[in-house]
UniProtKB/Swiss-Prot annotation:
Domain of life per record: Eukaryota
Name of the gene: terD
Protein name: FAD-dependent monooxygenase terD
Reported biotechnological use: Terrein shows anticancer activity on various tumors including cervical carcinoma, ovarian cancer, and head and neck cancer. The secondary metabolite acts as angiogenesis inhibitors through the inhibition of angiogenin secretion. Terrein also has anti-inflammatory activity. It shows an alleviative function of age-related inflammation characterized as an anti-oxidant and might therefore be a useful nutraceutical compound for anti-aging. Terrein may enhance osseointegration by decreasing the level of ROS and has a potentially synergistic effect on osteoblast differentiation.
Positions with a binding annotation for FAD: 6-35, 44, 137, 239-241, 282, 303, 319
Expression induction or repression: Expression is under the control of the terrein cluster-specific transcription factor terR.
Pfam families in the cross-refs: FAD_binding_3, Phe_hydrox_dim
Pathway this chain belongs to: Secondary metabolite biosynthesis
InterPro entries, alphabetized: FAD-bd (IPR002938), FAD/NAD-bd_sf (IPR036188), Phe_hydrox_C_dim_dom (IPR012941), PHOX_C_sf (IPR038220), RIFMO-like (IPR050641), Thioredoxin-like_sf (IPR036249)
Organism: Aspergillus terreus (strain NIH 2624 / FGSC A1156)
Keyword flag Cell membrane: no
Recorded phenotype for the gene knockout or disruption: Impairs the production of terrein.
Amino acid sequence: MSSKFDVVICGSGTAGLAAATWLAQYGVDCKILESRSGPLDVGQADGIQVRSVEIFESFGMAEELLREAYHNIEVAFWGSNPTSSGMGIVRKRSAHATTPGLSHMPRVILNQARFNEMWLEAMRRRNGQEVDYGHKVTKVTVDEEKATDPDAYPVTIVAQKDGQEQVFEAKYCLASDGAHSAVRKSLGFNMVGETSDSVWGVMDVFPRTNFPDIRKQCIIQSDAGSIITIPREGGSMVRVYVELAAGTNAKEVTLEQIQNASRQVFHPYALDVADVWWWSAYPIGQRIADHFSKANRVFLTGDACHTHSPKAGQGMNVSLQDGYNIGWKLASVLKGHAGPELLETYVLERQKVADVLINWDKVWAKQMCSIAKEDGGVVDANGKIDFSEVFVKAEAFTAGLTVTYGDSIITQAGDSNQQAATNLKVGMRLPAAQVVRFCDAKVMKTVNALPSDGRWRIMIFPGDIRQPSASTRLAQLGTYLFSNHGPIRKYLPPGADIDSLIEVIVILSGERLEIQQDQIPDAFWPTTGKYRMRDLHKIYIDDETYHNGHGHAYDFYGIDPERGAVAIVRPDQYISKVLDMKNHEGISAFFEKFLQKKGQANGSLNSHDEWTLA
C-alpha cells in the first residue's frame, strides 16, 4: 500500500528545508524523509554568506539569525615572516569580510545544526510541516509515460523504516540527501570531477592561545602550511582548517595530527587545545552531477548534485539557494498558477551556478595550498602567494551576489530596456536601496517590501508625480494594469485579493511632504484582507528621512526620474525584466509566457486547493 503526496523531499538538508519552507508558505503539504533518527545535532558548515542572510530576511527569520550568529566583520591575512629565525608568521594585511555596499546584510557564522533548526521552525510556523525521521530512502523511480500527465503521481519512492518497507507516490521529488544521494544513484546519475592529493583537517576547538587575531577570520600561509580560522558563535570556540602533509590519507588522519600541524603553522604563537567539539579530515575535490533532473519530476539539490572544498563557505549557502530556487516554482505549478515548463528553469539556472562554482573552487582551493606557488598562483613581489588579493577580488562571488540567471520564460534580458534602470540588472537579485514609506514615513529597504510570500512584483518608478508628465505616466499604467485585460486580473485566482499573485509597488521621487495621498491613483491603494481595508503600504518615496539621510534610490538603481522605469521581480527577488513606463504591453507579454489564466490551471493539488499566503 502506497501513500500519495504532491512533493516528497528525500533528506532534510539545507536545500530541502528551504524548498519545504516555500511549499509551506504556499500552503502545500509535502513529505520529508530523513534517514537520521532526529535533527542534525552537529553540523559541518558554519559560514553564512550575505545572500543567505538576505534570504533569511525575506522569510522574516533574519532577526533571530543575526542575534545568535557571530558577525564576521574583518579578515586578517598572515604569512611567513622573512626576518624571523626559523619558521614564523606575521600579519600582512587586514580587510573587510564583505565589501561595503555589496549588501545591507553582514556575513555571519552559525553552526549548520542551528541554521537548519531555524528552517524547521519556519516550516512549522507556516503549516505545521514536520520531518519524518528514521526513513532511509533506498530507491526512486519515474514512470516517464505518466510524467506528462499533470494529475499523475509518476514518482515512486521506496524507504525503509524500522525494518519495514514503505512506498510513497509523488507528483514531484527533491533529492536533498547529500553527497552520497540514494536518489541520484537510483536514477543512474553520476558525479563527474576529480579529487586532488591535498588533504585538510578541520576541528572546532576551544583554544588557549596568544595569537592576537583568534577572534577574527584568518588566512595564514606559512612555510609550514596553510590555515584558515573562523571564530564561532558564543565567543569561545574557533574552527581551524589546516593543510596536512603531502601524501596524507584522509581516512587515516588522527586528531593529534591535525593539532600538531596547526601548532606548526601558528608558530611562534602557542596553541593549546582545551577541548574539541568536532573534527574531521577530507581530501579536496570538486564534482558535479551529470544530470540535475529526471523527466521534470525529480530534481537534485545541494550536495546531491555538486560537491567542493568547504573552505570558502559555499556549500551550505549554494545548497540553500538551490532549495530557494526550486521551492517557489514547485508551489506555483502545484497551485495552478504556472505550467510545468516553469520547472525547467531550475536546471537552466542552478546547473550553471554549480558549473561556475566548481570551476572557481578549483582555483580557490589551489591558491590555499602550499603548492600553489609552483603552479603559477597569484604571488607578491617576493614570490609568495598573495591570497589577500584573491580573497578581496572574490568577495562578491563568495557573498552569493554575482549569480546572474540567463534568459528564459521568467528572465528576459533580451526583451528588456536595461537603459531604463542601468543598475537593476536583469537576472540578478534586486539590490536593496533605502526609501521612505509614504503612509507613515518609516525608513525601509526596498527588499523589505518584497518578502518571500510567493508573489510577483511589478515595481513602478514613475518619477516625481508633482510633474504632470510623471503623474500621467503613473495613472495610465495603473489603469492598464488593473483593467480586465491587464495582467493583474487576467491571472488572479478566483476569490483572491487583487494583490495575491501580482503585487504592484510604487516608488516615487520628490519631496514626500509636498505630495498628497489623493495625487496617487486609487488603484495603487487596493482594498484587501479580512476587513476589506485599503492597503497603504505599497507606496514609497525616494526622499530625505528624519534620521537616516537620503537613500538616493533612483541614482542607486540608475533610473532617470524624468523618464521613470518598471521592473518585474520574481518571488525569489531576482529581476525578470526592465521596461520603460510606456511599454504596457511588454508587461503583459512577460506574464503570458508562463502564468495560467483563470480556469486554465494544470492539474490540482492533493492537499490544499485554495490559494493561501501563510
